[in-house]
A protein has these predicted regions:
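Entry/capping segment at the start of metal-dependent catalytic domains
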Residues: 1-31
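Active-site-proximal helix-loop-helix substrate-binding element of RNase H-like nuclease domains
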Residues: 31-33, 38, 42-60, 64-157
Length: 157
């Protein structure tokens, strides 16, 4: 039976993703995965704060993350896939124990692309509004400010 693992991560880098792009952003030595949210087969969402000393992903999550029979879902899956490939130090070409970032990519599905195929806009905020989701289920309006505050370097004052 195929399983579905839905993933959302929050990350930090000292490189601006908007100016330099995803690859340079995630290749920075300062790059970190800070939060890892997941739901397996529609179960309630769990969040792991990887910034807490000694925090780690549960073994069950790691098992599903690397199980080829488990489909990984994310909104803008290319971001999650590449950032997690860097986090787990997966090579893009070389196989490590029969596994590489390239083979892992085939296990991912992008809910943003699925939505765009169905005629919805690409932005999470716009998609929530277009779907008519209740306000408490849409992207938080303060979300962009929080990401900017926690996920990018601060200018010294």
């Amino acid at each position: 039976m195929k399983h579905n693992l839905t993933i959302d991560i929050e990350t930090f880098s000292d490189i601006s993703i908007g100016k330099a792009g995803l690859y340079k952003y995630a290749q920075s030595p300062a790059f970190q995965v800070m939060l890892f949210a997941y739901s397996l087969d529609g179960a309630p969402v769990q969040v792991v704060d990887l910034m807490v000393p000694g925090a780690y992903l549960p073994q069950e999550v790691l098992r599903w993350l690397f199980d080829p029979d488990c489909v990984k879902h994310a909104y803008n899956a290319a971001f999650e896939w590449y950032c997690l490939s860097r986090y787990f130090k997966l090579s893009e070409d070389e196989h490590h124990n029969g596994f590489s970032a390239a083979t892992w990519l085939q296990q991912w599905q992008c809910s943003m692309l699925h939505g765009m195929y169905a005629g919805y806009p690409a932005g999470l905020d716009a998609t929530g509004k277009a779907l008519g989701l209740p306000q408490d289920q849409q992207k938080m309006s303060i979300g962009r400010s929080l990401v900017r505050y926690f996920c990018t370097p601060c200018t010294p004052t």
